[in-house]
Amino acid sequence: MFMKRLAIALIILLALAVAGAYYFNQYWIHRYDAMIARQASIYRLDPDLVWSVIYEETYFSPWKKGSKGEVGLMQVTPAVGREWAAETGMRDLARQMERDPQAVLRDPEKNIQIGCWYLEKLYEEFRDLPGVEARMIAGYNAGPSRAVEWNQTEAGAEPLSIEQFVARIDIPSTRAYVTSILERYRKLKLQRGGATTATQNRNATTGAGR
């Protein structure tokens, strides 16, 4: 009888542990959803794409620091943060970025804001091309100039498909990064019954960008 009760207790504890792990994971990956939605709306981006980028960059760890000085949820560099502050005319934040960029970039909402601003700049670079998401993501990871290089075609040629563009990425880590985000983004949109589109409400006049 004792062993039977012990087995039942262990099963219950195991079930509680599994349920707890599941709900904690759901909390962890969705606790910034409101911030993502708010900033994505300002910069007229699809929040699911922004979410997918953050998932890949840091798995929602706001304190993560990259090997090249990237900081926070979207792994923003101080240089990009200073560019954002200068272009948006936020003098107080520009001064803060000069004094202590780490403090600004560790703030989850500021980090998401700057990351969305940068993604919108990349959207504007490639907006007329099919599969703009792939170009945006590649530029976010490897820099806009490399994304432009990979996107080049002969004069008069058809624009590259997503598959053709990804195949041209000659940095393995960037190719894996782009592929992973696109697949996660696609699955997320399928779960929600929507189409993959990098931006939302592009005819709106809200937002700021390059």
In which residue ranges do the predicted regions lie?
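N-terminal Sec-pathway targeting helices
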Residues: M1-V18
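Catalytic and substrate-binding regions of cell-wall glycan-acting enzymes that process beta-1,4-linked
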Residues: A134-G194
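Cell-wall polysaccharide-cleaving catalytic domain and substrate-binding groove, primarily
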Residues: Y55-V80, G143, Y185
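Substrate-binding/active-site groove segments that recognize
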Residues: K68-Q96, I114-Y118, L160
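Extracytoplasmic/secreted envelope proteins and their assembly/folding machinery
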Residues: D33, A37, P47-W51, L73, ...
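Export/targeting segments at the very N-terminus of extracytoplasmic proteins
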Residues: L16-W63, S67, A85, E109-I112, ...
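Surface-exposed patches in mature extracellular/periplasmic domains of secreted proteins
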Residues: L49-W51, L93, F126-A138, S161, ...
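Second-shell loop/turn segments in exported
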Residues: Y22-N25, R38-Q39, P62-V71, M97-E109, ...
